[in-house]
Amino acid sequence: MILGEYVLRDLFPDLDEDQYQPAGIDLKLDRVFRLEGRGALLEGDDKRLPEYREVETEGGVFELEPNVPYVLELAPELEIPEDTAVLFLPRSTLLRSGVSVHTALGDPGFRGKIRVLAVNHHAAPYRIAHGERVVQAVFLRAEDAGRYEGDYGR
């Protein structure tokens, strides 16, 4: 079952009014990073992320160069209830503009900043203002779910 706007208003009462949607909440762009160096996912739990270099804004606007992967850090920090999972979906304006946003599932009990990968597939740079809504979080009730015990949240 997808949690609707009125349930989400109770769970997240401090959002801006424009973040509440009928079937989710919009997350806003906070910080942007370029990936540098090598990462790896090896046997067992051997994970190595590439280095992240923060991208500065020009007058509050980030510029995504063509065919470069960027990590977008979103606001606000989320605390996902233990009986809920979250699907993160890109805003359709980005897709219609040639910017793909790659996401993952938010596990029950995860708490922290959400980061997604974005790639501008257009030939020209794409500009996004700090604080713009870029991803919609859709909350799904998860029966008999375990709790998040990964490396990236608290």
Curated annotation (Swiss-Prot):
Q: What is its EC number?
A: 3.6.1.23
Q: What is the enzyme's class at the highest EC level?
A: hydrolase
Instruction: Please name one Pfam family that this protein belongs to.
Output: DCD
What reaction is this protein's catalytic activity? dUTP + H2O = dUMP + diphosphate + H(+)
Q: Which CDD domains match?
A: trimeric_dUTPase (cd07557)
Q: Any idea which GO molecular function terms this record carries? A: dCTP deaminase activity; dUTP diphosphatase activity
Q: Which UniProt keywords apply?
A: Hydrolase, Nucleotide metabolism
Query: What metabolic or biological pathway is this protein involved in?
Result: Pyrimidine metabolism; dUMP biosynthesis; dUMP from dCTP (dUTP route): step 2/2
Listed GO biological process terms: dUMP biosynthetic process; dUTP biosynthetic process
Concerning InterPro entries, the annotation shows: dCTP_deaminase, dUTPase-like_sf, dUTPase_archaeal, dUTPase_trimeric
> What does the record give as the function of this protein?
This enzyme is involved in nucleotide metabolism: it produces dUMP, the immediate precursor of thymidine nucleotides and it decreases the intracellular concentration of dUTP so that uracil cannot be incorporated into DNA.
**Protein family per UniProt:** Belongs to the dCTP deaminase family. Archaeal dUTPase subfamily.
Q: What's the name of the protein?
A: Probable deoxyuridine 5'-triphosphate nucleotidohydrolase
Tell me which species this is from: Methanopyrus kandleri (strain AV19 / DSM 6324 / JCM 9639 / NBRC 100938)
